[in-house]
Swiss-Prot record:
It comes from Campylobacter jejuni subsp. doylei (strain ATCC BAA-1458 / RM4099 / 269.97). One of its GO terms (cellular component) is cytoplasm. This is Peptide chain release factor 1. Its main location: cytoplasm. It comes from the Bacteria. Peptide chain release factor 1 directs the termination of translation in response to the peptide chain termination codons UAG and UAA. GO terms for molecular function: translation release factor activity, codon specific.
């Protein structure tokens, strides 16, 4: 029975309340921070549990009043409302009981690269960057460009952005993979539709303590920053290239105003890539049955098609098709795709957990 599964959460929450009011904990900042975080994480399930248990009590109380000559009719109406509320609360609680993705609340690095399609792919990277910027603004996230390489006719060959905001990873993690675009290039005189592709990688920003890097494993090169077309934009060696020798991962950063700033940003991206590599290795070891059917987030997995002539956007992971591509791109309305993906992921997880 669901109610019996919830009792440990209530007991632990009360225990935390007691601990956090004790003088021993109040004098230990580290311990207090850890316990406060646990309490905050438990609060949603505890509040929903209390609402659910109160609903169960109210159902029993109203059942007992059904034969009452004065209150029976009122109890019948109230019982109908409560019986409709009960399964909704149960579903909400089951979702809260699902194992949490530890990365969900993190900031993210969003890395977008032009793939097949040459200039057209670079232009679409630029369009997607603008759309993601509007999405970030809609959700109250802050977005900053970490590094970029412009395309020869506009857009970007590649770009890395840092998206800051609570829950950024929980939503944008669904963007990882290959995005295919079909549209008529401006240079196409006969109106033929061209197909190009770009890749998106979503990497959680990680703390220094989570990823330890041996300085001896790094090769750091400094060089002149270059602007569009290779033009030198300053007279100091401020651009930084860091190579992680064991993995061969290379990160270049030249967008900052100083060598120190560029090195700092490059190290953050390197740590995110190493963390992503570790996570992918961990996921690969899990059984296929436990992998979410929403997709792995692997940048080689084709997840979505943007068809401009048809004003169509299709997400292949859940067979979702919407004919409002223009509005989604113009206003950054990616939640119209992300919300169904989250719902699908939760349904799969509930099935796996037998909840």
């Amino acid at each position: 029975m669901l109610a019996s599964k919830l009792d440990p959460f209530l007991k632990r929450f009360e225990e935390l309340n007691s601990l956090l009011s004790s003088s021993d904990i109040l004098n230990d900042i580290s311990k207090m921070t850890t316990l406060s975080k646990e309490q905050k994480n438990l609060e949603p399930i505890v509040l929903k549990t209390k609402e659910y248990l109160k609903t169960l009590d109210n159902i029993e109380e109203n059942k007992a009043l059904l034969n009452d000559p004065e209150l029976g009719e009122l109890a019948k109406e109230e019982l109908k409302t409560l019986e409709e509320l009960k399964p909704k609360l149960e579903e909400e609680i089951k979702i809260l009981l699902l194992p949490k993705d530890l990365n969900d609340e993190r900031n993210i690095f969003l890395e977008i690269r032009a793939g097949t399609g040459g200039d057209e792919a670079s232009l679409f990277v630029g369009d997607l960057v603008k759309a993601y910027a509007r999405y970030a603004e809609n959700r109250g996230y802050k977005l900053e460009i970490v590094s970029s390489s412009e395309g020869s006719v506009g857009g970007f060959k590649e770009i890395i952005m840092l998206v800051k905001g609570t829950g950024a990873y929980s939503r944008l993690k669904y963007e990882g993979g290959t995005h295919r675009v079909q549209r008529v290039p401006q240079t196409e005189s006969q109106g033929r539709v061209h197909t190009s592709a770009i890749t998106v990688a979503v990497m959680p920003e990680v703390d220094d303590i989570e990823i330890e890097i041996n300085p001896n494993d790094l090769k750091v090169d400094v060089m002149r920053s270059s602007g569009h077309g290779g033009q030198s934009v300053n007279t100091t060696d401020s651009a930084v290239r860091i190579t992680h020798i064991p993995t061969g991962i290379v990160v270049v950063n030249q967008d900052g105003k100083s060598q120190h700033k560029n090195k700092e940003s490059a190290m953050k991206v390197l740590k995110a890539r190493l963390y992503e590599m570790q996570e992918n290795e961990r996921l690969a070891k899990e059984s296929e049955a436990r992998k979410s059917q929403v997709g792995s987030g692997d940048r080689s997995e084709r997840i979505r098609t943007y068809n401009f002539p048809q004003n169509r956007i299709s997400d292949h992971r859940i067979n979702l098709t919407l004919y409002r591509l223009d509005a989604i791109m113009q206003d950054g309305l990616f939640d119209e795709i992300i919300e169904p993906l989250i719902t699908h992921h939760q349904a799969q997880a509930l099935q796996e957990q037998n909840l």
